[in-house]
Amino acid sequence: MSTPTAADRAKALERKNEGNVFVKEKHFLKAIEKYTEAIDLDSTQSIYFSNRAFAHFKVDNFQSALNDCDEAIKLDPKNIKAYHRRALSCMALLEFKKARKDLNVLLKAKPNDPAATKALLTCDRFIREERFRKAIGGAENEAKISLCQTLNLSSFDANADLANYEGPKLEFEQLYDDKNAFKGAKIKNMSQEFISKMVNDLFLKGKYLPKKYVAAIISHADTLFRQEPSMVELENNSTPDVKISVCGDTHGQFYDVLNLFRKFGKVGPKHTYLFNGDFVDRGSWSCEVALLFYCLKILHPNNFFLNRGNHESDNMNKIYGFEDECKYKYSQRIFNMFAQSFESLPLATLINNDYLVMHGGLPSDPSATLSDFKNIDRFAQPPRDGAFMELLWADPQEANGMGPSQRGLGHAFGPDITDRFLRNNKLRKIFRSHELRMGGVQFEQKGKLMTVFSAPNYCDSQGNLGGVIHVVPGHGILQAGRNDDQNLIIETFEAVEHPDIKPMAYSNGGFGL
């Protein structure tokens, strides 16, 4: 480490202060650039690394945040903020034992810190649960019962929320197998009228459906998801009057989802929607978004589709708020049903044999094919490696080849990887989500890959647009320097106002900065 000149120290301090301004304005990517410039000028200052770690954390670059915290602590072992940020980065990477060590250091210096205390309790809970899973070995999976497919609706009949319910009504059919055992539920009268009343008379007024209704909706939707392959195939080449709209992360931003449908049109026989994962967590209306999507799936099974994202998983839901939101609004049992229904979601969608849509990105195996995706056994929690995990977690990078992920899970894949996969599988483009893009939709890797992100002003802080990709064969709108595909239309939308409830308002995990 070379000793910086006095002039470089002064310039570095200026860049750090500029980065701090961007952080206050919640422009975290710009802040990262300024902190990096400061570090390039003077790499002896612990605070520059811990500040950049904060900005990396805010854009989900958890591995990069952790690496910066390591350097900050090496330079200054008394940098308490760096310990806190490293602990939270470890939690995001599901490394709870490592996080607990840093939290204990923090609490030794600040015994009454409420956020650290809450985070430590969360770590302890995860560690206990992991010990329990290891203690029972494989018995858990062997004994796992599908709550959705064995649902007994009458078990909800005594609940007070049902007796007091005055909202729109649903009719249910209790299903049985050939041995007369409970086999889930079916909604007999799902309608646009019910969905509209559910949204306007309940959700927009801060009210909830009875738990019996929610359980039946989840069970019915789960049955539909289970009937779909791990890679769904959609086609509108032969029906050019049918639009397919591909949307990215929505993260519980219910009011923005409603605005999306208002702006781009409702689901119907002439308009198919595909939401590309991460529709829960972060935002504080994740239950409302999930129930709206599940109702739309029941009403329009051939025109509404969901891919699974990395946040449709148990560990993410425990950390980022969906489990706690479910428990607050409904019950642990309802969350468990949602969690099992997430295991039924497809992992990818192929449109017109041209466009492959997955939440994260391409697998690291160079021989991977579409047939491999079809054959993935998806009915489980995502593993820590392999194509299943990579479809949910991988990110693109500008450099060729494979690289480490800034998130710490998955990997980064270069334009050569994308080009080879497209050629080998005779595809035009990859559509993926998983990362915020300020413009809502971004063409990357020489136009071979597109990232679509549909949560405008993400977490009430980023100021980004939301985006949508419409697949309209032969009727696209070309845009110089942007859209080069005659089959696509790119549109964006801004965030709308919502009640003053902060992101992750129901979370008890102590996960935040």
From Swiss-Prot:
Assigned EC number: 3.1.3.16
Subcellular location: Nucleus
Pfam families from the UniProt entry: Metallophos, PPP5
Binding residues annotated for Mn(2+) 1, in chain numbering: 249, 251, 278
Catalytic as annotated region, ranges: 188-513
pH-linked activity: Optimum pH is 7.8.
Hydrolase among keywords: yes
UniProt cross-references to InterPro entries, sorted A to Z: Calcineurin-like_PHP_ApaH, Metallo-depent_PP-like, PP5_C, PPP_dom, PPP_phosphatase, Ser/Thr-sp_prot-phosphatase, TPR-like_helical_dom_sf, TPR_rpt
Details of cofactor binding: Binds 2 Mg(2+) or Mn(2+) cations per subunit.
Keyword Nucleus among UniProt keywords: yes
Induction: Expression peaks in early log phase and decreases dramatically during the stationary phase (at protein level).
Cellular compartments per GO CC: cytoplasm; cytosol; nucleus
Notes on the domains: The TPR repeats mediate protein-protein interactions with substrate proteins, but also autoinhibit PPT1 phosphatase activity.
PANTHER family referenced in this protein's UniProt entry, alphabetically: SERINE/THREONINE-PROTEIN PHOSPHATASE 5-RELATED (PTHR45668), SERINE_THREONINE-PROTEIN PHOSPHATASE 5 (PTHR45668:SF5)
Misc. remarks from the entry: Present with 6990 molecules/cell in log phase SD medium.
Free-text function comment from the UniProt entry: Protein phosphatase that specifically binds to and dephosphorylates the molecular chaperone Hsp90 (HSC82 and HSP82). Dephosphorylation positively regulates the Hsp90 chaperone machinery.
Entry protein name: Serine/threonine-protein phosphatase T
The species this protein was found in: Saccharomyces cerevisiae (strain ATCC 204508 / S288c) (Baker's yeast)
